[in-house]
Amino acid sequence: MNTLTKLTIGAVALTGSFLAAAPASAAPAADTTASPALGSQVSAQFASVTIRNAQTGRLLDSNYNGNVYTLPANGGNYQRWTGPGDGTVRNAQTGRCLDSNYDGAVYTLPCNGGSYQKWLFYSNGYIQNVETGRVLDSNYNGNVYTLPANGGNYQKWYTG
């Protein structure tokens, strides 16, 4: 083995050890591979379901103006969402797609096929925006936004 080959192998091994040592609170990469911080990716294809926040128990809700928030369960279609399998999450009442931006705002817009409207679902409850890599988050006031994954229950959501 020549010196260049040894240096290349050493550099790759060293780089790999730095990548493996990244803290779990680091911002998630916006790709479709499983991340130790996010868990295993699961199917985003589902019929009309509710999306419940693990910490607050409130349901993801929306309106025709595009506002997104959480409310206690009320049985309405504004609290129901569909996942047709293309990565979008659509409000059952309005037909609009869940959308976000790099500032962390979450809202709905008419579906346009863009990556800001694509979401990845993970086995431990994270819902990650494909474009920004940030995950859906909430609080007891009903606000909904995205932040880098931090392991908290406000960032975990369950369909039902």
Swiss-Prot record:
Proregion positions: 27-46
SUPFAM superfamilies: Ricin B-like lectins (SSF50370)
Keywords: Antiviral protein, Lectin, Repeat, Signal
CDD domains xref list: beta-trefoil_Ricin_AH
All copies of domain Ricin B-type lectin, residue ranges: 45-160
A UniProt-annotated Pfam family: Ricin_B_lectin
Cross-referenced SMART domains: RICIN (SM00458)
GO molecular function terms attached to this record: carbohydrate binding
Chain segments carrying region 3 X 38 AA tandem repeats: 47-160
Domain of life: Bacteria
Sequence repeat windows: 47-84, 85-122, 123-160
UniProt record, GO biological process: regulation of defense response to virus
Signal peptide range in chain numbering: 1-26
Stated consequence of mutating Q79A: Partial loss of HIV fusion inhibition
Misc: Anti-HIV protein that inhibits virus membrane fusion.
Quaternary structure (record): Interacts with HIV gp120 and SIV gp130.
Name of the protein: Actinohivin
Gene giving rise to this polypeptide: ath
